[in-house]
Amino acid sequence: MTLKNKWVGASIGAVLLAGGTMLLIKFVFPEPVRRPIVNEARGLYVALERLTEIPQSLTARLKPLPVPAYRLVIDPEHERELDDYFRIQEGNLDREKIYVPAVFYDPDGRRYDVRVTYRGDGGQHFRFPQKSWRIVFPDESLFMGKKAITLIYPEEREFLVEATNFHRAKKLGLAAPETGFVYLFVNRHEAGLYYEFEHWSEELLERNRLKTDGNLYGEQGLGSEDLYRSTSHWQQYVANAPGAEHKEDLALLIAILNHPSDEYFNRNIDDILDLETFYRWNVHALLSGSEHQDAIHNARLYFDPTLGKFKYIPWDVNIGDLEAPIESRGIDPKDYNPLVLRILAHQPFLEKRNRLLREYLADSETVADDFRYYDELYQTLRPAFYRDTLKNYSNRFFREEVARYRDILSRNIAYLQEHYLEAEPPPAAPAERERPLAEPDGEYAPPVPTGDAFTYFHDISRSPEEFLAAHPNFSKDTAGELHLGPGSVVLRATTLVPENTRLHIEAGTDVFLDAHASLVSYSAIDARGTAERPIRFLPLSPTEPWGTLAIIDAPNESRFENVFFLHTAKRPDPPLSPDEHRTIAGPINGMLFRGMVTVRHAAVSIAASTFAHAAGDDALSVQYGSFAITDSLFRDNSADAFDADFASGTIMRTAFRDSGNDGVDIDGTKALVEDVVVTRTGDKGFSLGASTELELKNSVIDTADIGVAIKDDSSATLTHALIVGARIGINIYHDNPIFPAATATAKVSASVIAQSTERTISVPRDAQLAMDRSIIEGGFPGSAEDVIDVTPRFRNAAAGDYRLLDAPGGETIGLRYLPRVPR
């Protein structure tokens, strides 16, 4: 008998022996005897069962890996160092994190010099051959835009449950870490299948379209302390917002939660915690029957510096079975998260949460997508699970657990549909009144913000009457809405207009603001002047700028017509450099402001208005909102004229002249721009940050460092556009490290790019550029036949007439007509 036949025979014998032993344990021994055997000798039992599954593992190895493969190379001495340290420190939740050097190879073979450690507090993460890892990448060489990743065994996250939970989170509009499944090799040996997620970082925030100048909190270690009683129980993953050093935002949230008055709590909680996000976060947990984001762990709170509020981010949601009767338990446990409990104890808040829950449950396609995703994930990953021989469970256990968790997810949906879709849900339960006030050793004193980051917080919820008592230069109409003007009005200090009203600024009003004084409104502003009686915002100081005119989270659209904004008496000199930032107002309720006019989480319409001499980063800044700008002029601003982040809108018949930096700087934004003139910009005519879509029609860019900059994965369509006098006409490049390369796309049609001092167009390998029926002076390799290399002549460029004097290639190239914009 050959050696090969002997090995095959031995393998078959081992399988038969293991199978016989399994059958003996399962069918011969009664349950009271069988269970202790399995529990006490789980490792042996699993090993025997795994022997019977050798054919499945061998079959899986014949197939390509269905997931990315990572390779980690670590010196055995360093691995022993980690083993010894974690074994000695097991159970010590306050242990230091130690890292050792290693080399990481991505699926494409790229090498990264990294630092690694074991991840996790319990011994299950480092006592067995399949360990959990945290891998930290160098700042100058991020991995897929990530600073750090964690690899844990999938059983720790209920196999496919957490991936499904994060899939749901994205459908609900919640931020979430990027996750996935990977196969790991350590020092050339298989380490098995892992669940990967990125670590909490600025990069994670940016990937979720959240500003990195906020704060990101999580619990400090894994203890038994109530997170919602002290700021000392929280750590900061990101600490960039005003007051971060003393956790002023968190102190305010905890103080409001623990205030004895329900009226005070209900009035103020939505001004420090974004309740719309809270409802989505809570519904997300309910769908999994989860109580895992409780008072002691798994809390992730992001303070949004554009909104001045916290937002929950789901984390380690887990799964639970909603099988208790609705009358005795309901879906809102009374003892797991005090902030959840107190919010939902207020009937109007509870009804809003229930409305969102019903919307999700009533959408059959949305519900079906959850299970379709779960099932497809199982089918994709099953071969990788079968291949993994280091896992501490059998293939049968994996299949049964996946089926069991799916059944729980299904029962939870059915339970919620029965009680919250087909029946009237129960009313809110009363909050536990003794919790906020009593401590074993005496009266509880909640934390108090110690700095000035939230000086104006209680102004947000003022009534119009309370506001007028503090600001008698305003008035109120019979509808309860506020008015300012006409005539001259002086604001010597920052004034905050409360929510739930509207501010009307009358035609013919001159608002003089003292140095660094701001007007911040949590309600829509209606400022409609006329050509004869404009509204003007002017500096009171002859040398210093005023602060900002800001609109924050207003539910209705604000309108500005025939409004003149002058930030300083003369243009700030010198202009800001492209990488320099200048704060002109704040902190105001945890927010800083760099725009002369700032619109956040709101809609604005601007017509026939002028923005001049802005001293900060932007003349007009729109973040997480919408804009419609027509017939307006931006001139002599120190940095960017218009800046939009994660917004959408239109710009029509508008001029941007003599900007220190960019004419238009848009990031994560979708914009339609037509009949616009951008002249003499210090940096870019149009700057397109990541994930931006620009449609530019019949517009002119004259004299800029870069005419149109298209970064990362953005796209631009230029039709009947003109770019002259730039160092580079169109520049496509990689800018943001969270994107692996520049994959931008640009289409240029019926346009003219000429008089570039360095190069006409710069395009990297991974980007795409299509051109037709255009004049490209100097030409461009690979262009279509109707792309002409000539030097164009204009009718009167000095006077702003950029129409072609002659039309090589036909009348359809260049401007269709002369844009009529303010001079």
Go through each PLM region and give its residues.
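Internal "kinase-insert"/substrate-recognition segments embedded within catalytic cores
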Residues: L174-P177, H189-N282, Y378
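Middle-to-C-terminal accessory/interaction subdomains
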Residues: A255-D294, L301, G308-A453
